[in-house]
Amino acid sequence: VIIKALAFGLSLLLAGCAGASGQEPVKVTAGRFLSALASGDHGSACALLAPRARESWAPADCEGGIAGANVPDGVPETVSVWSEEAQVKTARDTLFLHESPTGWLITGAGCRHRNEQVYDCVVGGP
């Protein structure tokens, strides 16, 4: 019983450490997306969108669509990760991400919460 308790405690400790390091790739992706938008590099911003977020526009018009989406600028402040899903908050925006086999992708940006569980996003959604 003691060994099981120690093993469980060690696994919790390791999970806590992994959680903090697991936030960095999410924060980097969100930062790259926001920087691309701020600099007008809509092609790079579109490349960071998950397919379901790009579905907001015709396949050939992601760049035009995202240029007119008015996603608030900002820098990532808080990051929450739940397995393959993540949320990043800036001072004026909430972004949602999904971990794909190639890395983290933006699934929603320009999101404002309507209530505790529902978000409206100008790009994609949660």
Where are these regions (language model features)?
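Sec-dependent signal peptide recognition
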Residues: 1-8
